[in-house]
A protein has these predicted regions:
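N-terminal, active-site-proximal structural segment of metallo-dependent hydrolase catalytic domains
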Residues: 1-73, 86-89, 260-262
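Acidic/histidine-rich helix-loop elements
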Residues: 24-42, 87-89, 114-118, 144, ...
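Active-site metal-binding loops of divalent metal-dependent hydrolases
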Residues: 26-28, 61, 141-143, 174-176, ...
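Active-site neighborhood of phospho(di)ester-bond hydrolases with catalytic His/Asp-centered motifs
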Residues: 57-60, 81-82, 171-175, 194-198
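His/acidic metal-ligating clusters that form di-metal
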Residues: 126-141, 149-176, 181-186
Length: 262
């Protein structure tokens, strides 16, 4: 798999089947990289420039001030879930968020993730919306870098997000801090397909189903960002990346079409 920085241009809605969604997952590095509002402003500009703006945006390492700025500049609604209070340069909270290009958005709840080895607080947060009358739940998460925490946190995310599959299609975007060859990601495979692993090509030395051949790397020399989609609910799944000069991650853009209701 080769990192591609070419700007992805998605086709307009008129060129795609009904129910086709664009989904964006992005770790802004909103506090540690010191770019303050520049990373949020660049993201808003790129979203606005797209022929088809993403219906779902999942964000990590985000300051509440940046979240508010995105909502002020984009026709989106959503939910910000803090993980560390008053962490950011402007005194605002630090956390994860889900944005949806619709006013039909309600919080579906959050869950604190286990950390048997200790470390920074981690969470998964979800919102409920609908696409052409069909229920959709979108979740965002950011997992720990310590392998001792990864397995239990992935399992908790899979359980929390998977519970919504009874009555909704589900999207989970996040920085999982694990490369595709890691067995720790296995719990997500049971109920989800990863957008960047939907082809028949495989990364060298990797035979796992999620080690797809698309250019979906982030961070930016290895893949740790993912968009997972509930199995059986989506067709035509694909993913690409674009550049992000103010972050140490690259935006991961997924495209998928909702399948007929189960």
């Amino acid at each position: 798999m080769v990192l591609v920085y070419a700007l992805l241009r998605l086709p307009a809605d008129a060129d795609t089947p009904p129910g086709t969604l664009s989904i964006l997952q992005f770790n802004l590095c909103g506090n540690a990289c010191g770019t303050r509002f520049a990373v949020a402003d660049d993201l808003a500009a790129e979203i606005t420039s797209r022929g088809r703006q993403p219906f779902v945006v999942t964000l990590n390492e985000l300051c509440r001030g940046q979240y508010d700025r995105l909502l002020a500049n984009l026709p989106y609604h959503g939910h910000f879930e803090p993980t560390i209070r008053n962490r950011c340069w402007d005194g605002s909270d630090y956390g994860v968020a889900v944005l949806v290009r619709s006013s039909d958005v309600t919080s579906a709840g959050s869950a604190r993730l286990p950390a048997p080895a200790g470390g920074e607080p981690r969470t998964v947060t979800c919102v409920r919306t609908a696409v052409q009358g069909r229920p959709l739940v979108a979740c965002a998460t950011h997992l720990d870098t310590d392998p001792a925490n990864t397995a239990s946190q992935v399992a908790a995310v899979a359980e929390h997000a998977g519970a919504f599959r009874a009555d909704a299609a589900v999207v989970v975007g996040g920085d999982f801090n694990a490369t595709p060859d890691r067995p720790a990601l296995d719990p997500m495979d049971a109920g989800f397909v990863e957008a960047d692993a939907a082809d028949d090509a495989f990364t060298g030395g990797c035979s796992r189903a999620r080690c797809g051949g698309g250019p979906g790397y982030a961070h930016p020399t290895r893949k740790i960002d993912y968009v997972f989609l509930s199995r059986g609910d989506f067709t035509g799944v694909s993913a690409l990346v674009s550049s992000a000069p103010h972050s140490d991650h690259t935006p991961l853009w997924a495209t998928a079409t909702l399948a007929p209701a189960r």
